[in-house]
Structure formats: C-alpha cells, structure tokens
Amino acid sequence: VGSEMCIRDSDIDAYTMENVFFVPEEARWNTIADAAHTPEIGIVLDNAMKAIEADNKKLKNVLPKNYANPDLDKQVLGDVVDIFTNSIDMSKTGIDEDLLGRTYEYFIARFAEKEGAGGGEFYTPSSVVRTLVEILKPYENCRVYDPACGSGGMFVQSAKFIEAHNGNRSAISVYGQEANADTWKMAKMNMAIRGIDADFGPYQADTFTKDLHPTLKADFILANPPFNYHPWNQEKLLSDGRWKYGVPPASNANYAWIQHMIYHLSPNGKIGLV
C-alpha cells in the first residue's frame, strides 16, 4: 500500500484520527517490490501482513499470512507483485484515496464471477447497490446496517452517496454481520481500505442464532441476504423476540430475514432489500 494520505509517516495517531490504516515501513510497496523475485518473497509478504495488523488493531487476525507456504509458487507470486508495480505507481504519495478501494472491488467482482452463483453470497453488483442507495438516500450521522453484509458493498456505496451530496463520509455509523469467516475478513479489509469505521462484531457469526447487534435500531437497512436459505435453526429460535409477526417457517429463511430487519429498524427507518 503506497498512499500516505499527506500525513507524516511516523505519526500513527494522525492516521487513526483520519480513519486511515497505517502502513509500517516493512509493509510498504517498495519493500515488497524489491523482494518480488527473491526466494524470500513469501516471507516478506507474511511479515508485511503481520506488521500491518500490529499497527492496526481492527485488522487483527484478518489479513492472510500464508504466502510463505512451500506449496505456493513464488515465481507466480512475484509476477503478481509485478502486475501491481507496473500498473500503479504504488510508491508515490497523494494517490487517489479511492483508487485502492476501486481496485479491491474490481477483484472481488471478478472473483464473484468465477464463483458463479456462489459469488452472490459475498458480492452484490455495484449497480444494484447504487440503485438501493439512491432510493433510500442515507444522510450524515445515520446508522446503516446489513445483516448479511458479504464484502461490505452496501456500506461503500452509502458512504459515497453521502460524500457526493456534500456530506462527511466518515459521519456514518456502520453495522454489519457475516457468517462466513473468509467473507467477514474481506469486509473488514474493504472498510479499512475505504477509510470507513465499521462494527462487524468481534468475529463472524450466524445472524439468526448469534445476533451481534441485539439492541441496534438502524436508520437504514440495506441487504441482499441468501433467500431460500435452509435449514436456519428455526427449532432453536421458536420464542425469539424478533418474530413479531409469527415464527417464520422452517422450510426457508425468507420471512426470518424480513422480520429480523424489521426488528432492527428505527421508528422512521427504511429498508432496501434485494
């Protein structure tokens, strides 16, 4: 990661105040690029991930640290590093702060395409998300919630909408939950890259059996949950307080998702549901 956001390299607190994650010296792109075609590239990348996590507590246990795996082709790894080095000047300061976020989103989208139908579990096309956000029109100091947040695209577009309407993109409270561990990590990284402060809970968890935001009342709920999802542990939740309109059927989670969202909606809140 090369962008220094015009803040002094050594001033970690300044980065934190600006909601920008700090990249220590051993994790900066010049260090990685210099080692691209050495036998130690895997170790260099693992050390970079560890250093970033050490200086950014919100990313603790989130970044991959298996690049030194002997089964991983180090020549291919070096070639991937070269692609970024030759395509983007990762060393200069003042890089468009949205560039890395857009790059990250691009790769998530391509990965979702390769996964086929399974890719919909963690990625909703940005055009769909933008449509939801344009309809709901989130505002500054609002609370936005996604109970099946995937890689966090709903939050990215909400922050962009607020910024585009002369608001402060940091003045948004983001809450999400995700059951898949890898996807939860993707969302955490997405928010860090975008400079969005988010509460996704301390770990991944099933939204129905372990609601990580039990008292939340959100102003906006945007979601593309896995409909027709079953089994969803209905038998363990028969007396749950979220089922204001009756216990949802065990056959699929459609009405469980809808009632969960209604339960977490503020009195004047709005829901955007795919």
Model-derived features: positions:
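Conserved Class I SAM-dependent methyltransferase catalytic core
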Residues: 1, 132, 184, 249-274
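Non-catalytic, mostly N-terminal accessory regions of nucleic-acid modification and defense proteins
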Residues: 1-3, 8-140, 199-212
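A detector for short, charged/polar N-terminal pre-domain segments
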Residues: 5, 244-248
